[in-house]
């Protein structure tokens, strides 16, 4: 079997990933033939977005196992898994996908067609992601009124998944149901995923979109120009605390102050049942150059100190609901998240 979407393409021997660093100006694919190359693509944000990272890692796992030469196959598998796992610490889908692949490995380690079984599992994961996103979209669209203006942050669209998207999936599904929707996309410094990726996706779909600077959101909310905020997630704790792109917490505080519903759209696989609250979620710190430079040009003084956390945590008291493929979760989050996980 093969896979071909805008975000990624699996040929059976390699994984091609749309280089999201070069969008919206250049549509170019990077071909990965080894698990190390997939790990590099994840680390360098050639591919990004929690669900997309997870599926890319699953295909990287397949490529790595195929490169096995001699010695203990289990030891080699653990090396491959570790190389992929240490790329980005916050997105739980990465570890969920690798653990799922490892489980299949141990269940079939003695089978002659082990590599084929692993490839089929990665493909199954990819196609499941598309269906999950469409279900998230359908569930979330019911919360969006006709004529709404939606504020979103970063990119939780088709580019952040195998296809369709989570937060943008909600917007897509609302539009597909006949609703008139307008979107304000935060530019999302420092990597500009909103300006570069979200705007690009929505324009291709013919959905009305405005790019705004991150610090405009409060002004727009106060003027009554935002009806709802819809964002994605990289990890959700058992109590509903949510890690997402840096700046999400600020939007949630502003939304709460202005009585605007704040929705998180994410697959159940983004919920980490081993973490009770957001205080336990590891936050990735990225290179200072992402802040001091923009478009390859330095915009800050030489030698200035920089903080560059890639994510922040929004506590559950600021979240109106979490939209998943299994349904919409409302407070009390810990109780209702446990119910969803049991479904």
From Swiss-Prot:
<dbReference type="InterPro" id="IPR000649">
    <property type="entry name" value="IF-2B-related"/>
</dbReference>
<comment type="similarity">
    <text>Belongs to the eIF-2B alpha/beta/delta subunits family. MtnA subfamily.</text>
</comment>
<dbReference type="GO" id="GO:0046523">
    <property type="term" value="F:S-methyl-5-thioribose-1-phosphate isomerase activity"/>
</dbReference>
<feature type="active site" description="Proton donor">
    <location>
        <position position="234"/>
    </location>
</feature>
<feature type="binding site">
    <location>
        <begin position="48"/>
        <end position="50"/>
    </location>
    <ligand>
        <name>substrate</name>
    </ligand>
</feature>
<keyword id="KW-0028">Amino-acid biosynthesis</keyword>
<feature type="binding site">
    <location>
        <position position="88"/>
    </location>
    <ligand>
        <name>substrate</name>
    </ligand>
</feature>
<dbReference type="InterPro" id="IPR037171">
    <property type="entry name" value="NagB/RpiA_transferase-like"/>
</dbReference>
<dbReference type="Pfam" id="PF01008">
    <property type="entry name" value="IF-2B"/>
</dbReference>
<feature type="site" description="Transition state stabilizer">
    <location>
        <position position="154"/>
    </location>
</feature>
<dbReference type="InterPro" id="IPR005251">
    <property type="entry name" value="IF-M1Pi"/>
</dbReference>
<dbReference type="InterPro" id="IPR042529">
    <property type="entry name" value="IF_2B-like_C"/>
</dbReference>
<dbReference type="InterPro" id="IPR011559">
    <property type="entry name" value="Initiation_fac_2B_a/b/d"/>
</dbReference>
<dbReference type="InterPro" id="IPR027363">
    <property type="entry name" value="M1Pi_N"/>
</dbReference>
<dbReference type="GO" id="GO:0019509">
    <property type="term" value="P:L-methionine salvage from methylthioadenosine"/>
</dbReference>
<comment type="function">
    <text>Catalyzes the interconversion of methylthioribose-1-phosphate (MTR-1-P) into methylthioribulose-1-phosphate (MTRu-1-P).</text>
</comment>
<keyword id="KW-0413">Isomerase</keyword>
<comment type="pathway">
    <text>Amino-acid biosynthesis; L-methionine biosynthesis via salvage pathway; L-methionine from S-methyl-5-thio-alpha-D-ribose 1-phosphate: step 1/6.</text>
</comment>
<keyword id="KW-0486">Methionine biosynthesis</keyword>
<protein>
    <recommendedName>
        <fullName>Methylthioribose-1-phosphate isomerase</fullName>
        <ecNumber>5.3.1.23</ecNumber>
    </recommendedName>
</protein>
<feature type="binding site">
    <location>
        <position position="193"/>
    </location>
    <ligand>
        <name>substrate</name>
    </ligand>
</feature>
<feature type="binding site">
    <location>
        <begin position="244"/>
        <end position="245"/>
    </location>
    <ligand>
        <name>substrate</name>
    </ligand>
</feature>
């Amino acid at each position: 079997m093969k896979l071909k979407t805008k975000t990624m393409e699996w040929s059976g021997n390699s994984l091609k990933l749309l280089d999201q660093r070069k969008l919206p100006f250049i549509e170019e694919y990077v071909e990965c033939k080894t698990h190390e190359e997939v790990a590099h693509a994840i680390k360098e944000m050639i591919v990004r977005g929690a669900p997309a990272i997870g599926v890319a890692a699953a295909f990287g796992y397949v490529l790595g196992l195929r490169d096995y030469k001699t010695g203990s196959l289990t030891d080699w598998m653990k090396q491959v898994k570790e190389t992929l796992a240490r790329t980005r610490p916050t997105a739980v889908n990465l570890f969920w996908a690798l653990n799922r692949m490892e489980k299949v490995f141990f269940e079939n380690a003695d089978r002659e067609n082990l590599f084929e079984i692993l490839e089929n599992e990665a493909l199954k994961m990819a196609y499941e992601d598309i269906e999950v996103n469409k279900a998230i979209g359908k569930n979330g669209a019911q919360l969006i009124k006709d004529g709404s203006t939606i504020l979103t942050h970063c990119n939780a669209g088709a580019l952040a998944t195998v296809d369709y998207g989570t937060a943008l999936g909600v917007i897509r599904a609302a539009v597909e149901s006949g609703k008139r929707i307008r979107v304000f996309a935060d530019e999302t410094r420092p990597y500009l995923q909103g300006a570069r990726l979200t705007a690009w996706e929505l324009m291709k779909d013919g959905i009305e979109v405005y790019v705004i600077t991150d610090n405009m959101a409060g002004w727009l909310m106060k003027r009554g120009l935002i009806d709802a905020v819809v964002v994605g997630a990289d990890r959700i704790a058992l109590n509903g605390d949510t890690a997402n792109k840096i700046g999400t917490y600020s939007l949630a505080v502003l939304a709460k102050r202005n009585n605007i519903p704040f929705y998180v759209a994410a697959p159940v696989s983004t919920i980490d049942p081993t973490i009770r609250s957001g205080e336990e979620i590891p936050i990735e710190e990225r290179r200072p150059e992402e802040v001091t430079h923009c478009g390859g040009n330095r915009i800050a003084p030489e030698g200035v100190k920089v903080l560059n956390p890639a994510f922040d945590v929004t506590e559950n008291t600021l979240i109106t609901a979490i939209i998943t493929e299994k349904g919409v979760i409302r407070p009390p989050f810990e109780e209702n998240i446990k119910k969803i996980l049991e479904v």
